[in-house]
């Protein structure tokens, strides 16, 4: 045996690194990707699933990248996407709320406190908008997979799942604050006669009004009393988007 090889084997044994018989060594590819272990396979998605659906938004796209390795273009199965999206949304909103609550108790002058409250309000409004966008993206998958033919039931299931986030529970459960825009009675959509352009235009208008309502509620809660509320502006916009 060659002297160098014998020395390498001896050093490996002394450090407890002796190779086990039958062990396959994993090496990184040219792109830095680690190959999958034998026997580990992702569940195969349905053949026609996702053909009529919109592409994922940024938060859900990040979720899909976490489920599958880079460089693999796979359609997520319905159950995986629905459960994963709710968990991802819940985790993201909770992290946002923790950072907001931490910044809501600073020590400093009155001006610093006022500035911190403004930043907290902006953070919560941004979180509310992302919340609604995720709900909007989750709805088409739910209406096609959970309750086809019943858009109202699908919407109820989406909001029921999304309201897991504690800070937004009051918004999704309070029908008084929604006034002319009620999430429990959205624009009528039927998958049997699905018109994507008209349907999503109606839903865009519906969610814009919801987003403005949520923004008004959060801004009134955290903003200073000297700042004029945005309620009048959102009321005009809601009236423009809601059919009479």
Swiss-Prot record:
Biased composition (Low complexity): 219-233
Feature: compositional bias, Polar residues: 99-110
Protein's UniProt keywords contain Cytoplasm: yes
Keywords: Activator, Cytoplasm, DNA-binding, Nucleus, Transcription, Transcription regulation
This protein's record includes keyword tRNA-binding: no
GO biological process: auditory behavior; cochlea development; cochlea morphogenesis; craniofacial suture morphogenesis; genitalia development; genitalia morphogenesis; hard palate morphogenesis; inner ear development
Top-level taxon of origin: Eukaryota
Identification of the protein by name: Dendritic cell nuclear protein 1
Native source organism of the sequence: Homo sapiens (Human)
Lineage summary: Eukaryota, Metazoa, Chordata, Craniata, Vertebrata
Gene: DCANP1
């Amino acid at each position: 045996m060659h002297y160098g090889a014998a020395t390498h084997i001896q050093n490996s044994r002394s450090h407890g690194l002796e190779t086990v018989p039958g062990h396959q060594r994993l090496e990184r590819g040219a792109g830095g990707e680690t190959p999958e272990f034998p026997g580990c396979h992702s569940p195969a998605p349905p053949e026609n699933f996702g053909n009529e659906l919109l592409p994922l938004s940024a938060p859900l796209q990040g979720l899909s990248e976490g489920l599958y390795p880079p460089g693999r273009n796979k359609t997520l199965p319905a159950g995986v996407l629905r459960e994963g999206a709710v968990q991802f949304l819940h985790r993201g909103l909770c992290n946002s709320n923790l950072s907001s609550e931490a910044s809501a108790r600073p020590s400093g002058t009155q001006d610093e406190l006022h500035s911190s409250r403004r930043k907290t309000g902006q953070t919560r409004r941004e979180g509310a908008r992302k919340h609604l966008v995720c709900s909007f993206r989750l709805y088409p998958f739910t209406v096609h997979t959970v309750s086809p033919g019943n858009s109202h039931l699908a919407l109820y299931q989406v909001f029921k799942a999304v309201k897991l986030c504690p800070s937004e529970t009051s918004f999704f459960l309070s029908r008084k604050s929604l006034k002319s825009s009620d999430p429990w009675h959205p624009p009528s959509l039927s998958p049997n006669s699905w018109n994507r352009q008209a349907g999503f235009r109606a839903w865009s208008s519906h969610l814009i009004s919801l987003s403005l309502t949520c923004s008004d509620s959060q801004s009134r809660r955290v903003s200073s009393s000297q700042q004029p509320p945005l309620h009048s502006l959102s009321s005009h916009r809601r009236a423009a988007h809601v059919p009479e």
